[in-house]
A protein has these predicted regions:
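Phosphate- and other anionic-substrate recognition elements at nucleic-acid/protein interfaces
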Residues: 1-176
Length: 176
């Protein structure tokens, strides 16, 4: 089935690629490149989450409505989603919510007819962090090398940094 958009992005040549670091502390980054102006803009959003109170406990879930609004505000060419994997120290319900969020992201892409690619962390890190340690803090260092004006002041901004690097990896994979 051929995918068509009538919003005008084909005529401008703009490229919009999203990179997503899955999880409640993850983020969504948008790589926007306009070839004629040789301009690159990076936008980054925290993963939209809602807190749900169940008795005395509070849990988090991805806010699908806000996520869809964020996607709809960008005329996406392609989305690169970090392939979710549960960790051995994660509890069952935490792992379930994490994987549910991963499924929501894929479902929104399918529902909005935006092509997506799942990318293992080792894949994008090998390309984007070549010659560097692959620790969480290192992705912030790498983003600051590539985008000196990008503001990532907190150690907890590693999700944003990962999303930016995933979007850049996606752009490289697509030849931009």
């Amino acid at each position: 089935m051929e995918r068509r958009r009538t919003s005008g992005w084909e005529e401008t040549g703009d490229i919009f690629i999203a990179g997503i670091d899955v999880g409640f502390t993850g983020a969504i980054s948008f790589y926007h490149h306009h070839p004629d102006r040789k301009r690159l803009v990076m936008e980054v959003y925290d993963m939209p989450v809602i807190k749900i109170k169940k008795g005395k406990k509070t849990s988090q879930e991805i806010d699908e409505s806000v996520l869809r609004q964020i996607f709809a505000a960008h005329k996406l060419t392609h989305v690169f989603i970090e392939k979710a994997q549960t960790m051995s120290d994660q509890g069952i319900s935490s792992a379930g919510r994490y994987m549910c969020g991963f499924g929501i992201l894929r479902g929104i892409c399918v529902g909005m007819q935006v092509p997506y690619t799942l990318v293992r962390p080792q894949q994008w890190k090998k390309i984007m962090m070549s010659g560097m340690s692959k620790g969480k803090g290192q992705s912030i260092v790498r983003v600051k090398q590539l985008f000196p004006l990008q503001d990532l002041p907190l150690k907890s901004d590693h999700g944003k940094a990962d999303a930016i690097l995933i979007a850049c990896y996606g752009a490289k994979e697509m030849g931009y």
